[in-house]
Every structure is written in structure tokens, then in C-alpha cells.
Design a protein with these regions (language model features):
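A helix-boundary/hinge signal
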Residues: 1-172
């Protein structure tokens, strides 16, 4: 009686159940985020980067370790054991230093998001289109600066990371 069939019946979700409403609301939230992202006037490679970051499919140390790549899990910049996309692009001291230089709402944005996708959702609501475009460019520039630090052993100052993001957005 309490086997697989019982479990399946318990997990079956009716059209009007709270669980299905919650699942549907999450899908709708995702659609709103993606729709806003696809409408931004940013280079396709940056759009692809933010999309991949939001889905947590960037080649972070944590994701590489999940694929059984032997790698030290500590952050290459700060040595923290937190190596998530959210840490890399928002919480790491390098990222925080860059975000502190951005003027306006971005500088004062809350960092209590639990995932990068949650952060994107939050910022999508708070920022204007222009600010959101700048945010994507800065995130992409932080990622590139970290890669330069790791692969080329070249450290880019925070103000240069921000400047390159602003210039790239202006040129686009």
C-alpha cells in the first residue's frame, strides 16, 4: 500500500493545488526575467554570459568539481571556500570593489540573494533598463578580469574593470 504507486499518487499535483500554483509562479518569474534579458541592448556574448550565469552553468570551480575535474575549490581571488557564480560576480571582494564604484542604485543594491538567478530577479525589478544593461556589462567584465587574473596572472584594478564595462556598453 505504501509503495511506489502510493508515493506517485501523493505527488500527483492537481490543477488548482498550492504546489502547482507555486511551480507556475516560478515559471512565470523565470519568463519575466528572460524576456527582460532578451530585450536588452547588449552584445550577444554578454547576454549569453548572463543567461549561463543565471542557470549556473558557467565553468566555475564548483561546477568543474561536479564534473570530476580535479581542482582546488577555493576562490582564486580571495581564498574563500565559496566558489559559486553569486560569489564570483557579486560577493567576492574584487566584485564588491567594482560594484562600489558604480553610481546610483547598483552601488547600494542588497546582496542578500541566495543564488545568482535570485539576484537577477531582484535587480530586474529595481533597476531601469539602462542600469540593468550596465549591470550585465559589469558582471561580464568582472568575469573576464577574474579569468585574466587566473590564466594570465594579470590583476586588473577595480576602476579599470568598471571603465571597460562602460566603454564596451557605450560602443555597442
Amino acid at each position: 500500500m505504501f509503495g511506489f504507486e502510493w508515493f506517485q499518487r501523493q505527488m500527483t499535483i492537481g490543477k488548482g493545488s498550492n504546489v502547482s500554483k507555486l511551480a507556475l509562479s516560478r515559471v512565470q518569474e523565470g519568463k519575466q526575467v528572460w524576456n527582460r534579458l532578451w530585450k536588452l541592448s547588449i552584445p550577444p556574448k554578454v547576454l549569453n554570459f548572463v543567461w549561463r550565469a543565471s542557470l549556473d552553468i558557467l565553468p566555475t570551480r564548483a561546477n568543474l568539481a561536479c564534473r570530476r575535474v580535479p581542482i582546488d575549490l577555493k576562490c582564486v581571488v580571495c581564498g574563500s571556500s565559496d566558489k559559486t557564480v553569486l560569489h564570483i560576480l557579486w560577493q567576492c571582494p574584487l566584485a564588491r570593489n567594482v560594484w562600489a564604484l558604480v553610481k546610483g542604485k547598483l552601488q547600494k543594491s542588497d546582496s542578500s540573494a541566495r543564488t545568482f538567478f535570485n539576484l537577477v530577479q531582484t535587480l530586474k525589478e529595481r533597476l531601469s533598463r539602462k542600469e540593468f544593461e550596465l549591470w550585465t556589462m559589469v558582471a561580464w567584465s568582472i568575469w573576464n578580469a577574474r579569468n585574466r587574473f587566473y590564466f594570465e596572472e594579470s590583476q586588473t584594478p577595480s576602476h579599470a574593470i568598471l571603465k571597460s564595462a562602460e566603454m564596451f556598453l557605450d560602443e555597442y
